Curated annotation (Swiss-Prot):
It catalyses: (1S,2R)-1-C-(indol-3-yl)glycerol 3-phosphate + L-serine = D-glyceraldehyde 3-phosphate + L-tryptophan + H2O. This is Tryptophan synthase alpha chain. The active site is at E49 (proton acceptor), D60 (proton acceptor). Pathway: Amino-acid biosynthesis; L-tryptophan biosynthesis; L-tryptophan from chorismate: step 5/5. Tetramer of two alpha and two beta chains. It comes from Escherichia coli (strain SE11). The keyword Amino-acid biosynthesis applies. It comes from the Bacteria. Belongs to the TrpA family. The keyword DNA repair does not apply. It is an enzyme of class 4 (lyase). GO terms for molecular function: tryptophan synthase activity. The gene is trpA. Keywords: Amino-acid biosynthesis, Aromatic amino acid biosynthesis, Lyase, Tryptophan biosynthesis. The alpha subunit is responsible for the aldol cleavage of indoleglycerol phosphate to indole and glyceraldehyde 3-phosphate.
Length: 268
């Protein structure tokens, strides 16, 4: 959890925002997935947002669903994902690692046991995509017991009450939704969310990172200009993996070419 605090403090000092890529663990296979993550970090990723393959991903558009299917085809299990997380943490001791999850995967383990395992391998945050804030108590309490930041989604239409709850319960960062709907780079992020950012600041929420539909450097810059602490890009990155599925080296090179200007756009 503290890794987010020190990251945001360092970025503030350097007058930079955070660029955070999302990928599915084990896509397209364990070995290449670990290389992908190393490449993202080398190219300038400030933190990682990682998915564990799940058979019914509700919030995901077709691109990320395909990533999940590729990981399943490679036989990747949640247990192997945790082994991967331990390896990533060993190699990269300071980078914040967040998981984007669905409740079933947390329940399968038992809520407390799941967060205990996160703590053990060095996961900093968990966002459970299909648990609304009013049902989040058992998740966020277990998270805090194990020094894992509970992350909450702030939708574009959030009312004052929801903004206060997000500020009060969330830690690490706040996932600021560019728009309602499922993830995907096709639907470019809508207008900057200045009013939400201002309200979240007023209520002392964890720094907002804007996600959903972020696929170009100008969108990263727009998010930061609107007051967000950074941007999360998932589908655009997963698409690169898909496009170069049979050319592992080309894939890594293309990921680097995508991430470098995205990170550069965070520098004011």
């Amino acid at each position: 959890m503290e890794r987010y605090e020190s990251l945001f403090a360092q970025l503030k000092e350097r007058k930079e925002g955070a660029f955070v890529p999302f990928v599915t663990l084990g896509d397209p296979g364990i070995e290449q997935s670990l290389k992908i993550i190393d490449t993202l970090i080398e190219a300038g990723a400030d933190a990682l947002e990682l998915g564990i393959p799940f058979s019914d991903p509700l919030a995901d558009g077709p691109t990320i669903q395909n990533a999940t299917l590729r990981a399943f085809a490679a036989g990747v299990t949640p247990a192997q994902c945790f082994e991967m997380l331990a390896l990533i943490r060993q190699k990269h001791p300071t980078i914040p690692i967040g998981l984007l999850m669905y409740a079933n995967l947390v329940f399968n383990k038992g809520i407390d046991e799941f967060y205990a395992q996160c703590e053990k391998v060095g996961v900093d945050s968990v966002l459970v995509a299909d648990v609304p804030i009013e049902e989040s108590a058992p998740f966020r309490q277990a998270a805090l017991r194990h020094n894992v930041a509970p992350i909450f989604i702030c939708p574009p239409n959030a009312d004052d009450d929801l903004l206060r709850q997000i500020a009060s319960y969330g830690r690490g960062y706040t996932y600021l939704l560019s728009r309602a709907g499922v993830t995907g780079a096709e639907n470019r992020a809508a207008l900057p969310l200045n009013h939400l950012v201002a309200k979240l600041k007023e209520y002392n929420a964890a720094p907002p990172l804007q996600g959903f539909g972020i696929s170009a450097p100008d969108q990263v810059k727009a998010a930061i200009d609107a007051g967000a602490a950074g941007a999360i890009s998932g589908s655009a990155i997963v698409k690169i993996i898909e496009q170069h599925i049979n050319e592992p080296e080309k894939m890594l090179a293309a990921l680097k070419v995508f991430v470098q200007p995205m990170k550069a756009a965070t520098r004011s």
